[in-house]
């Protein structure tokens, strides 16, 4: 494991460790694209955060954003200022949920052939991104603080609640953004269970 530091725009210093299995993403996103001979415009990340009760953090998108009122994991595009793809993941987690990453565990193999990464376009369909999602440990799961420009609410959902996209408490629907998000979250639960059973 390697310790990482990065100065965040809000002066928060991101400090986290990561498993060797994700060291491939401990490089600038442009360097990753060049090394892997990819022509996508950029990379994006997602953070799967679980609490002590094995529930996952889901954020509800703002009503005036694309895919309004739908639910997703924290994440977003890498910035040119991000020291690495992993730093981009930790920064997005901080900006969207106010949570500090302490450890990045593994990447979710949600792509074709069981490889990590899902390719998608921006709203106009003119820019292409590949999103890598990671399971991330945080300082305190009880301290979620949303950016109201991006998200309006959050829930901690069980695997069963994600499968039916409905919270038991209050019988509230939690429709996920798309089938890709459903797959990422389901795979995150499966990998976590396999690790705990080992």
Please place each PLM-identified region on the residue numbering:
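Short, ordered coil/turn segments that flank beta-strands lining enzyme active or ligand-binding pockets
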Residues: 52
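Acidic, metal-coordinating catalytic segment for phosphate/diphosphate chemistry
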Residues: 2-46, 124
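Conserved Nudix-box catalytic region and its N-terminal flanking loop in Nudix hydrolases
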Residues: 55-95
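Active-site segment of metal-dependent pyrophosphate-handling enzymes
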Residues: 98-142
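A generic structural micro-feature
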Residues: 38-41, 70, 123-130, 148-151
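Nudix hydrolase/Nudix homology domain
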Residues: 2, 127, 131-133, 137-198
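Conserved beta-strand and immediately adjacent loop positions that scaffold enzyme active sites
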Residues: 46, 55, 153
């Amino acid at each position: 494991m390697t310790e990482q530091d990065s100065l965040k725009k809000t002066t928060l210093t991101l400090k986290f460790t990561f498993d060797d299995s994700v060291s491939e993403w401990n490089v600038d996103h442009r360097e990753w694209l060049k090394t892997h001979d990819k022509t996508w415009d950029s990379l994006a990340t997602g953070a799967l955060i679980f609490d002590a009760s094995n529930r996952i953090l889901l954020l509800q998108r703002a009503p005036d954003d694309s895919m309004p009122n739908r639910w997703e994991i924290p994440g977003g595009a890498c910035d040119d200022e991000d020291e690495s793809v992993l730093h981009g993941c930790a920064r997005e987690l901080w900006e969207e949920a106010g949570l500090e990453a302490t450890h990045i565990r593994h990447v979710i193999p949600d792509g074709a052939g069981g490889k990590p990464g899902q390719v998608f376009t921006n709203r106009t369909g003119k820019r292409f991104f590949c999103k890598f999602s990671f399971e991330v440990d945080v300082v305190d799961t009880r301290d979620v603080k949303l950016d109201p420009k991006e998200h309006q609410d959050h829930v901690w959902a069980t695997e069963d609640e994600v499968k039916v996209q409905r919270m038991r408490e209050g019988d509230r629907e939690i429709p996920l953004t798309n089938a890709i998000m459903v797959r990422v979250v389901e795979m995150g639960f499966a990998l976590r269970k396999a690790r705990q059973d080992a």
